[in-house]
Amino acid sequence: MLSNPIGISGGLDKHAEIPDALFDTGPAVVEVGGTTPLPQEGNPRPRVFRLPSQNAMINRYGLNSKGADHMSELLQQRVREFAYAQGFGEHELAEQRVLDGLAGVPPGSLVPGKLLAVQIAKNKATADADIEAVKRDYVYCVDRLARYADIMVVNVSSPNTPGLRDLQATAPLTAILRAVVGAAKGVDRQTKPFVMVKVSPDEDSDQQVSGICDAVWGSGVDGVIVGNTTNHRPEPQPKGITLPEQEQNALTQTGGYSGPQLFDRTVALVARYRALLDAPHMPEVAKRMQAQTAIATEAEPNREDVPSVDGGAPVDKYGGKTIFASGGITNGEQARTALDAGASVAMMYTGVVYGGVGTVTRVKQEMRQK
């Protein structure tokens, strides 16, 4: 059972250096990454711009990454230190015992009631048109990292990697996701990681959303994270209000926009994905997840007094695919609205950047008061 329905989105811990510190701030889900197979520098600096008057940001990091091997080493060391602390020893068998669940905690988060998501992407140098090469990039990441994750997140939606969003078309997306699902099923661990795909808020036409849903069902992934940063910019300021010159300049920068102004769009898109991913398609993966999980209707005495997600995986009350909402969520009322629209988890990034380490605690308190 997830202890609460709040998560921290990828980007705050790009290299999986501080997952435990992020868990300590209170979320039930922490997403690290995104990482690429090989190290890459990302885009030149400056590549992040703040808009304090809007509590918003524009970034064009370009998936700067130390590579999947580096992240794997960090996560493996984390598991081995946990195994030693729990009395399993410090050898390879001790690591395997923890990964197989003998410590009584999820093998990724290592914390009861919480899940670690690892976001993966292709290298910028890998040609978008070469789907076999793209698949190899994602599978390489799965092979290195899935042992240490509860959820693998397939990022095909960063606006800062040229051509990446083209992979959200139905045919290439289905092929990529099938490859990732197949690799995840082969992980040497008692329980296999779940697979989710992170989609763009800009791919929002009926045809695009429907095509992505077809790929989700056709590939067997377990859910969707809606969404990512957007290439769109907020509506102009009301008449008589002038942005500081620095922020006016920031709005002209190339990159993905994130902040509270995304919220309405995120909720609307969550509702659309929920409608399309509901019961009419019910292949075996949905039945499996429905049998394993559901939203808890009452908090257990030793659980946090916020909505809990039952089961060992991030799944909702709808009996189909899981949806995480990500984009513009900054308070408890918005988190509740995202859940009511069809999400199981409300994730935050920019809200945490501006709100600090107490943000998740505040949001959960606000949810309790509703």
For each feature predicted by the language model, list its residue ranges:
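N-terminal capping/small domains of soluble enzymes
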Residues: 1-81, 122-124
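C-terminal helical cap(s) of enzyme catalytic domains, especially alpha/beta-barrels
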Residues: 42-55, 234-255, 339-340, 345, ...
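Glycine/Thr-rich beta-alpha phosphate-binding loop at enzyme active sites
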Residues: 159-172, 208, 215-313, 355-363
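Glycine-rich phosphate-binding active-site loops on the catalytic face of alpha/beta enzymes
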Residues: 26-38, 220-233, 329, 335-364
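Catalytic cores of alpha/beta
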Residues: 13-24, 136, 203-217, 308-318, ...
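Active-site glycine- and acidic-residue-rich loops that bind
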Residues: 10, 123-139, 165-173, 195-217
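Active-site beta->alpha loop and helix N-cap motifs at the rims of alpha/beta catalytic domains
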Residues: 48, 54-153, 158
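Intrinsically disordered, low-complexity domain-flanking/linker segments in eukaryotic proteins
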Residues: 82-111, 279-320
